[in-house]
C-alpha cells in the first residue's frame, strides 16, 4: 500500500511503501539518501548468485529510473502546461522521459484535467492496461479534487476515486516546472527503492 509523499518546509520527504523493515529519508536539496532502518539480513552478497541478482536488480532500477515512459492523459487546460514541459524550453525527452501513445508501453500516467463520471471507467481501463510497476500523477486542481467544477453532478471529485494516485501536483493550472520537479522526484523514488517492494495495485 502506497503512502503519500509528505513534504515539509525544509525540502525533505519521507517515502515509504508501507513496509516496516525498510524506510528511506530523502534530502531533496542535497540529493542524498539516508537509510533509517536497514533491511533484515546482510547487505553484502554471500555468493556469486546473490551478486548476480543484486547487479541485475541495480540495472533494472537504473533502467526504470532513467527511462520512465509516461502516458499523457490530457483532459483540460492543464494538458497545455504538460505539453509545455515537453517543448523546447524544458525538453523532458533529454531526461529519458518520452511520452508513449499506448498504455501497454507506459509506466506513468499523467492525469491532467477534469475527470467526469463518464471518463472514470475509461481511465480505470487504461490504468489496468499499463505495465507494472506503474505510477499515477494527478496534475492540477481539477484532477486532484474537482477544482472549479467540484460541485457539478457530472464531475468525479478527484481521480483517486477511480485509480490510486502516487503524486498530486497542485495549481490551476500548475506550471511546467512543477511537473518537471515531480518527475525528477519520481525518478529518485524509483532509484532508491527495491523493485519487489512495488505492489500490483489493480
Curated annotation (Swiss-Prot):
Molecular function terms from GO: 4 iron, 4 sulfur cluster binding; metal ion binding; NADH dehydrogenase (ubiquinone) activity; quinone binding
Assigned EC number: 7.1.1.2
Reactions this protein catalyses: a ubiquinone + NADH + 5 H(+)(in) = a ubiquinol + NAD(+) + 4 H(+)(out)
The keyword 4Fe-4S is annotated on this UniProt entry: yes
Keywords: 4Fe-4S, Electron transport, Iron, Iron-sulfur, Metal-binding, Mitochondrion, NAD, Oxidoreductase, Respiratory chain, Transit peptide, Translocase, Transport, Ubiquinone
Class of the enzyme per the UniProt entry, highest EC level: translocase
Signal peptide positions on this chain: none
Top-level taxon of origin: Eukaryota
Location(s), subcellular: Mitochondrion
Pfam families: Oxidored_q6 (PF01058)
UniProt key word Magnesium: no
InterPro entries in the record: NADH_UbQ_OxRdtase-like_20kDa, NADH_UQ_OxRdtase_20Kd_su
Comment on bound cofactor: Binds 1 [4Fe-4S] cluster.
Cellular component terms (Gene Ontology): mitochondrion; respiratory chain complex I
One BP term from GO: aerobic respiration
Family the entry assigns: Belongs to the complex I 20 kDa subunit family.
Subunit structure: Complex I is composed of 45 different subunits This is a component of the iron-sulfur (IP) fragment of the enzyme.
PANTHER family the UniProt entry points to: NADH DEHYDROGENASE (PTHR11995), NADH DEHYDROGENASE [UBIQUINONE] IRON-SULFUR PROTEIN 7, MITOCHONDRIAL (PTHR11995:SF14)
Cited function: Core subunit of the mitochondrial membrane respiratory chain NADH dehydrogenase (Complex I) that is believed to belong to the minimal assembly required for catalysis. Complex I functions in the transfer of electrons from NADH to the respiratory chain. The immediate electron acceptor for the enzyme is believed to be ubiquinone.
Official protein name in the record: NADH dehydrogenase [ubiquinone] iron-sulfur protein 7, mitochondrial
Organism expressing this protein natively: Trypanosoma brucei brucei
Lineage start: Eukaryota, Discoba, Euglenozoa, Kinetoplastea, Metakinetoplastina
